[in-house]
């Protein structure tokens, strides 16, 4: 207990501007006041720490009484300074004690034991006469000493002198033990206790110990949540007066700490110290685990948590965990939507002050951070730090799943969403989700039509920066990306990466629905629309929608009548670039490629190759689902729609969908009634050309499709396919309800009506319905027979009828 009093006296009641001859009295006075408040003075201690018995209390009171009588009047001026002097420590408890003491009169501040003795001997008039007048009190409250740098005012000249050291960065008081320097001698005195004493003050809650009682008082507020210091401007409260003082600079705009190198000003000395490491490059804090160095001790402390594998800070809203409390605070603003920091230039708002500061440099053009290696300058220090990794090759952020390393922590965060599947950013217009906020921002340009990037050469505008960069290489002719295998060069790295897959056969993009893999993401994205049925590209003229932008572009030409693709050599124009390319390959219409089997000629060699497979029977393309083989990729793609159920062709009139374009074309003629294909032999007209061709074979007797098993020939290839199933026993069309299989789709469709009870064929005579057309036809024959009988009965004479009914 005595050690506590000693530390309390020596550490917490150093006051400035008190002359040496009054300090003894003042300290004894305060010591007596404290003991008086604690109860009867059963024990006391002096500055040397010697124990004193209770009987010595009266002796000390007597001694203090005499000292006050001798020095009270002469020390009044200094006592007034003592009343108004600034406190030397930032201890909040001492501030309140001293402030309460100063609010009381000098008579009240003399503890009762001394006050009673003085009053008894000399009367109350002695003390009352010693009190300052009202004018003297007003003079005491004045602040006549004003700083030249920042205009701050002080009551005492020594306070101004101490304050000016902040601007000059002068630290004349140096510790002989550690060499640490201070602005004020009082701070040096407090610091020296570190070397001379231990940590006598312990927290009752968590057991933490402190060197100063003021530190313990401040620490206790972390348990109690007490924030007694309130800002008059905005009402924000703080646990420490120093924090309030720093906060108030936000309102006043005061930035008293100036960098000698670049002249930049800061509101806190710690911010200045951190800033100065930009110029010095000093990183004094080193991690013992990995050797990484940091400019701040707080950054090292936060870094240690990474090695410990702990994320102690959890968001109450979404449960996300963080290494640092500052990260949690920043994250929570996402849920609140708060953006308190606004740019005065453009009105843009930010949820962090640092981001606003970085943003302002866009308007000012300031780039204070310079790379020592290449001289490149940056507007933000974080950008410089990341840039320097280009020179060092450092990639400190490593994925635990796949081992991939990154030079940005944000890139690692985005990358990890590939493994977790997390896509937290959602488009409010179309509902599309993204794993990175930047992708959402860029995606929004699809809806807004914004094209903020323009080419300086030709003025062409672009939605995406990558498109602009790629376009600019068209002007320069630059192709910086070269394939190591074949030497082919490319405008951008993406095209090179995609090209390399042609050598490696890599197909990294897999469909989650059906497991199909693709070499290119664009192919996967296009494929996914088969499962989702999504058609995001819509024609504003007719409302027709498409799965691909290129398809919409081709369609739009129908409305404009434009033929944008011109042949420079022959002047021909085409709707599609593919048709122009085809024309370039064969501008004369010549068909130089001839089939040796049947003599048929083709414009392109690929067409001949496909044709020859009919003769050879080669079918290199196999369906993964059912094992069926095909002679071309297009026929395989059409076949796969049977398994996926995709019907991409929709009738705009009735909404009916079709698996093949030819099916839609045939169906469309039902609405128009058009039958443009007419037989020259019999004059019969058809809606579809293929049906006309099949019909004409009836006149010619030609049956080009022959069965290899039995020799039977057919007019149509489809009839041959159906016939061959009689030999193979193949029944590819299976009912999902009962499992029954059929050789023809039409048979399956007819069968499924048994389960659905659908009867689409209705008799016009009696209203009876049937599952199949043949059933209706048979039924209608009955009506035809009844009508014939009725007709005969009506036409025959009555006597014949009567006679025919009489037996002979």
Curated annotation (Swiss-Prot):
Keyword annotations of the record: DNA-binding, Isopeptide bond, Metal-binding, Nucleus, Repeat, Transcription, Transcription regulation, Ubl conjugation, Zinc, Zinc-finger
GO CC entries: nucleus
Annotated crosslink Glycyl lysine isopeptide (Lys-Gly) (interchain with G-Cter in SUMO2) location: 137, 554, 579, 791
Segments forming a coiled coil: none
Family: Belongs to the krueppel C2H2-type zinc-finger protein family.
Function as written in the Swiss-Prot or TrEMBL entry: May be involved in transcriptional regulation.
Protein name in UniProt: Zinc finger protein 841
Name of the encoding gene: ZNF841
């Amino acid at each position: 207990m005595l050690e506590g009093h000693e530390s309390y006296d020596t550490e917490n009641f150093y006051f400035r501007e008190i002359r040496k001859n009054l300090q003894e009295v003042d300290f004894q006075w305060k010591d007596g006041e404290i003991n008086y408040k604690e109860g009867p003075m059963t024990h006391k201690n002096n500055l040397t720490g010697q124990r004193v018995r209770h009987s010595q209390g009266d002796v000390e009171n007597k001694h203090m009484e005499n000292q006050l009588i001798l020095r009270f009047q002469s020390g009044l001026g200094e006592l007034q300074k003592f009343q108004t002097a600034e406190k030397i420590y930032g201890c909040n408890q001492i501030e309140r004690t001293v402030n309460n003491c100063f609010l009381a009169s000098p008579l009240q501040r003399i503890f009762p034991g001394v006050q009673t003795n003085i009053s008894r001997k000399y009367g109350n008039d002695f003390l009352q006469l010693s009190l300052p007048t009202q004018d003297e009190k007003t003079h005491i409250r004045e602040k006549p000493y004003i700083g030249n740098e920042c205009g701050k005012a002080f009551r005492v000249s020594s306070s101004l002198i101490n304050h000016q050291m902040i601007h000059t960065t002068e630290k004349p008081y140096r510790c002989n033990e550690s060499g640490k320097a201070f602005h004020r001698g009082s701070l040096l005195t407090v610091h020296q206790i570190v070397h001379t004493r231990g940590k006598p003050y312990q927290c009752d809650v968590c057991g933490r110990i402190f060197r100063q009682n003021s530190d313990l008082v401040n620490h206790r507020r972390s348990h109690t949540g007490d924030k007694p210091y309130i800002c008059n401007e905005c009402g924000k409260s703080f646990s420490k007066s120093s924090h309030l003082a720093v906060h108030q600079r936000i309102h006043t705009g005061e930035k008293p700490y100036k960098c000698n190198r670049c002249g930049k000003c800061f509101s806190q000395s710690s911010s200045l110290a951190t800033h100065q490491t930009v110029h010095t490059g000093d990183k004094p804090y080193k991690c013992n685990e990995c050797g990484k160095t940091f400019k701040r001790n707080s950054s090292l402390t936060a870094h240690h948590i990474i090695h410990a594998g702990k994320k102690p800070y959890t968001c109450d809203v979404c449960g996300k965990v963080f290494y640092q409390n500052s990260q949690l605070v920043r994250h929570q603003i996402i849920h609140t939507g708060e953006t308190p920091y606004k740019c005065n230039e453009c009105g843009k708002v930010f949820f962090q002050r640092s981001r606003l500061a970085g943003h302002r440099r866009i308007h000012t053009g300031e780039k204070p951070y310079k790379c020592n290696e290449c001289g490149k300058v940056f507007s933000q220090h974080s950008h410089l730090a990341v840039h320097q990794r280009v020179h060092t090759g450092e990639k400190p952020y490593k994925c635990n799943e796949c081992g991939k390393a990154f030079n940005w922590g944000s890139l690692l965060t985005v990358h990890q969403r590939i493994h977790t599947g997390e896509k937290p950013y959602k488009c409010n217009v179309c509902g599309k989700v993204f794993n990175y906020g930047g992708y959402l921002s860029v995606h929004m340009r699809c809806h807004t039509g914004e094209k903020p990037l323009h080419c300086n050469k030709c003025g062409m505008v672009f939605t995406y920066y990558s498109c602009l960069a790629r376009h600019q290489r068209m002007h320069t002719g630059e192709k910086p990306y070269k394939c190591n295998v074949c030497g082919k060069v490319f405008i951008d790295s993406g095209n090179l990466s995609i090209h390399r897959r042609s050598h490696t056969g890599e197909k990294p993009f897999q469909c989650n629905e059906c497991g199909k893999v693709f070499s290119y993401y664009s192919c996967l994205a296009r494929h996914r629309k088969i499962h989702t049925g999504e058609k995001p590209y819509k024609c504003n003229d007719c409302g027709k929608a498409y799965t691909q932008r290129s398809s919409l572009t081709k369609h739009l030409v129908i409305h404009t009548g434009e033929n944008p693709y011109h042949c420079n050599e022959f002047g021909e124009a085409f709707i599609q670039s593919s048709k122009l390319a085809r024309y370039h390959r064969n501008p004369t219409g010549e068909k130089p490629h001839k089939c040796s089997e049947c003599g048929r000629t083709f414009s392109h060699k690929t067409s001949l190759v496909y044709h020859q497979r009919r003769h050879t029977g080669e079918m290199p393309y196999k369906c993964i689902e059912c094992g069926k083989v095909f002679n071309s990729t297009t026929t395989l793609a059409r076949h796969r729609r049977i398994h996926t159920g995709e019907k991409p062709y929709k009738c705009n009139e009735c909404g009916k969908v079709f698996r093949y374009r030819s099916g839609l074309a045939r169906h469309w003629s039902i609405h128009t009634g058009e039958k443009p294909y007419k037989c020259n032999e019999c004059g019969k007209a058809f809606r579809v050309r293929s049906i006309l061709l099949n019909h004409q074979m009836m006149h010619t007797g030609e049956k080009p499709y022959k069965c290899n098993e039995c020799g039977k020939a057919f007019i149509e290839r489809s009839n041959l396919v159906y016939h061959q199933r009689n030999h193979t026993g193949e029944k590819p069309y299976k009912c999902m309800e009962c499992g029954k299989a059929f050789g023809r789709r039409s048979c399956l469709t007819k069968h499924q009506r048994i389960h659905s009870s659908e009867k689409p064929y209705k008799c016009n005579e009696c209203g009876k319905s049937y599952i199949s057309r043949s059933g209706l036809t048979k039924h209608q024959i009955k009506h035809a027979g009844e009508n014939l009988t009725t007709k005969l009965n009506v036409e025959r004479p009555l006597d014949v009828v009567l006679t025919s009914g009489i037996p002979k």
